Each structure stands twice: as C-alpha cells, then as structure tokens.
C-alpha cells in the first residue's frame, strides 16, 4: 500500500495548540467498527462503552523536560531534543544548529551546564552532561517540555502538568501518550467503582513518533524503536479478563504497540521487557485488544495506519472526514476517538 492511501485534508485551524481547561472536557468520536457507526459524544461517555468486567490498560510513562537550549563554543545557538536517557549522565539526542557538531565538541546550556558530544549513533548524538547534579534533576532545572513540532508556541509552566497524564510515574518519554491526557482521577475512580479493572505498563515514547514516513510504499518503511515493559500484572489481568468474558481496551497506540509486541512472543501473553519496532498496518492480526482510546493522528502517519489496521482504512478516513466537518480538535492536545474493534480482530 502507498503512504498516500492514508492521507487526509486537515485545516491548520483544527490543530489544537493548547489543552482545554478540564481534561475530560474533550469531545469523543465513537467508531463502532463492527457496524461502521459513528457517534459524537464527550469524553466521559466512555463509561457507557467500557463495561464492568472490562480491562483498561494504561501507559504510566512520564514525559521528561527533554528540550534544552544553549550555544556552541563559537557562540552559535543550539537546540537539543533528548531521545532517551542511556544511563548515568549520558543520553541520545537530536541537535539542531547551523553546523553539525563533531565528537568532542562542548556545548553550554542555559544555566552554564556543559554537555560533551561523544559521537553519533545513527540519527542521534551521544551526549554526556558534565555536572555533579544528577541528570533528571538537571532536566527539571533547565529543560523545557518537548511539545510536538506542530504546536507552534513556546512551552509554558502549565505544560508541565497538562502534557502529562495523571497516572504518569516512570520518567523516560519525550512525547506524551496523549490518549491518557483525557483522564482525570475522578473519572478513573468512577470506572473502578463500576467494576472496570485497570492495569499499567510502560512504553517510553520517543521523538520518532513524529517522524514522517519517507518511503512511497508503507512496506519499505523502517519503524523507530522504543523501550517498553509489560509486567506480570498486565498479563495476569488480561487472563482474568478473558476468563470472565470481558474486553481489553488500550488507552493509546503506545499501549497497543506494547501489548501486541509482547503477544508476538507467544500466547498466552507473558511479561516482556525490551525494545520494540513493531509496525502495525492493515493486514496485522491483533491478538490482544478489543478497543482503543486514541487521539486523531497526523495525515499519512504510522499511527493512522495502526488505527486503520484495527478498524479498516475506509472507516478511519470516513471518521476523520466527519471529525474535520464537525470541527473536532486534532493531535496531542486535541479530542479523542473510541474505536470498538470487531470481535474477530482480537482473540
């Protein structure tokens, strides 16, 4: 299939650049893929669809303040976007500057902290922060929240809270698992009180999630890699859910990628920790999920392909056209979809 098969027209005015005042105030477009039906609602309406005995799987990754500004020894400005922390004072990162820095170069950040360029690893630079202060603390002091490239504004203190889920615990992501941004603690408590089980896994979202596909055919695309951990509690919760006849709902495409990566190692699913470069596109056979809560994704992106694999390409493009016509808000700070997959799509 061609990448252009997953393109759609999006007016720039529909790209949300700020969050709504309340997390649960977002709109919700419900797509019942089995019956090809759409319903316009607001986010709390998920309580009508996620029933007692169902399982909601969350991603508890926490976004780090991964964007840093500074200058080279020549005085030229640099912008650093961390991709992942690799241990101690080291990290992999993208660097934007007028001239590519060489190994051994020293960069100075806002606040005077020095960073040494150790070398290259593929598309990323290997960096070492020269400081006695632990790297996570340095980032909290000098880093900026890594808002996506389509949000054309500087980050604000409010983004430290709102570009983060209320259940974020494990630092390491450089982009938010945005489907989770719509939940607040009262809504989660209502779901639990109604008999919905929750389980958490971790997938540290990388900046590669925003990278465009540069091939004409999707089969020629090389997917970026991300680190994940699916603990025993998740596989046990899925087993319990299946035994009682419940359904498994993923909160976000990151959860889909994590669960289906673990399932690819064999079913019943076992705990899994490591890297994944799974590419989910039409033709993929889902083994775990029955439904997905997700945001609206960029035209021609791997995430549009993922939701198309679950619900069908034509159904997704039709739903997106409806969302555009109804003035839904798109992307990270935008509105949400609930996709109910045909039961045959998941075991």
Where are these regions (language model features)?
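Surface-exposed, charge/polar-rich loops and edge strands
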Residues: 1-347
């Amino acid at each position: 299939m061609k990448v252009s098969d997953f393109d759609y027209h999006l007016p720039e005015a529909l790209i949300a650049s700020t969050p709504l005042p309340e997390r649960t105030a977002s709109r919700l477009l419900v797509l019942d893929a089995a019956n090809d039906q759409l319903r316009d609602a607001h986010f709390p309406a998920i309580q009508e669809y996620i029933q007692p005995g169902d399982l909601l799987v969350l991603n508890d990754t926490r976004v780090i303040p991964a964007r840093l500004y500074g200058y080279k020894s020549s005085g030229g400005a640099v912008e650093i976007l961390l991709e992942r922390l690799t241990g101690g004072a080291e990290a992999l990162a993208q660097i934007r500057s007028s001239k590519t820095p060489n190994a051994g170069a020293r960069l100075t950040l806002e606040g005077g902290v020095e960073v040494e360029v150790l070398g290259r690893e593929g598309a990323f630079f290997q960096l070492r922060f020269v400081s006695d202060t632990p790297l996570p603390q340095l980032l909290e002091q000098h880093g900026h929240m890594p808002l996506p490239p389509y949000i054309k504004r500087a980050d604000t203190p409010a983004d430290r809270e709102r570009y983060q889920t209320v259940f974020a615990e494990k630092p390491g992501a450089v982009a938010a698992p945005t489907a989770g941004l719509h939940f607040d603690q009262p809504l989660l408590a209502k779901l639990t009180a109604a008999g919905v089980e929750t389980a958490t896994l971790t997938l540290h979202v990388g900046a590669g999630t925003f990278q465009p596909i540069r091939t004409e055919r999707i089969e020629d695309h090389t997917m970026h890699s991300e680190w994940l951990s699916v603990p025993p509690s998740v596989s046990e919760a899925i087993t319990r859910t299946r035994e009682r006849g419940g359904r498994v709902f993923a909160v976000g495409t990151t959860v889909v990628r994590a669960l289906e990566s673990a399932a690819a190692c064999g079913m019943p699913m076992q705990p899994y920790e490591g890297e994944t470069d799974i590419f989910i596109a039409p033709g993929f056979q889902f083994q775990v999920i029955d439904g997905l809560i997700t945001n609206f994704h960029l035209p021609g992106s791997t995430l549009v392909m993922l939701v198309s694999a679950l619900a069908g390409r034509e159904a997704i493009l039709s739903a997106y056209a409806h969302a555009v016509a109804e003035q839904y808000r798109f992307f990270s700070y935008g509105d949400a979809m609930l996709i109910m997959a045909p039961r045959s799509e998941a075991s």
